[in-house]
């Protein structure tokens, strides 16, 4: 079987979710501190990729840009489904 026939495996690594979680907590707190609606601002960033949705306070903008947006969305979906008992914890 040639390498072109093999299925590629997509994995962010076992330690990535904790990093994404910590980043989201920091970003959320920075947005609250600035008086913004954290959920709306984070969603705006995730949809557009525009870092202007995230303030520079507490280095929040640089922290969130260290993660790909699809990694952040994957973590949000994983945590949501795990907390609601919809899937096995991974």
Curated annotation (Swiss-Prot):
Pfam families (UniProt xref): IreB
Residues annotated as transmembrane: none
Highest taxon of the lineage: Bacteria
Similarity comment text for this entry: Belongs to the UPF0297 family.
PANTHER family in UniProt: UPF0297 PROTEIN YRZL
HAMAP family from the UniProt entry: UPF0297
Name of this protein: UPF0297 protein LVIS_1222
Source organism of the structure: Levilactobacillus brevis (strain ATCC 367 / BCRC 12310 / CIP 105137 / JCM 1170 / LMG 11437 / NCIMB 947 / NCTC 947)
